[in-house]
Amino acid sequence: MKRTMFKSKIHRATVTHADLHYVGSVTVDLDLLDAANILPGEQVAIVDVTNGARLETYTIAGERGSGVIGINGPAAHLVHENDTVILITYAQMTHEEARAHEPRVVHVNQDNRVIQLGNDPAQGIIPGLLRPPFALNNPAL
């Protein structure tokens, strides 16, 4: 049996542009893709912190160091320039792989520059923001 597990995320990125008339996808700075272990063409879930919208699409590599997070195509109806988003990937793993897996969590600033790397999906970096109630720190599976 395979399990679908959280693989990586780019946390609280700022959308730099939204282009309704592009074919589709999300353009992401290659530095961010590398930091999060996300490949161009990989499926991602996008959660819009600003308005609560959720969608799935695939990544396109953006210029390295540009900070680009560009929403392309019909998703631009849901996610807009300057919205705060979380890009999430999942992977299918065996039970043994899941037990050994350490996800990649990439925290970015408002300019989409990496400010912290980690592997705890519940750990925030916003001052005063606590872990979710009852969230364990790296529990054994």
UniProtKB/Swiss-Prot annotation:
The keyword Lyase applies. Is synthesized initially as an inactive proenzyme, which is activated by self-cleavage at a specific serine bond to produce a beta-subunit with a hydroxyl group at its C-terminus and an alpha-subunit with a pyruvoyl group at its N-terminus. GO terms for molecular function: aspartate 1-decarboxylase activity. CDD domains: Asp_decarbox. It catalyses: L-aspartate + H(+) = beta-alanine + CO2. The gene is panD1. Its cofactor is pyruvate. The active site is at S25, Y58. This is Aspartate 1-decarboxylase 1. Its EC number is 4.1.1.11. Pathway: Cofactor biosynthesis; (R)-pantothenate biosynthesis; beta-alanine from L-aspartate: step 1/1.
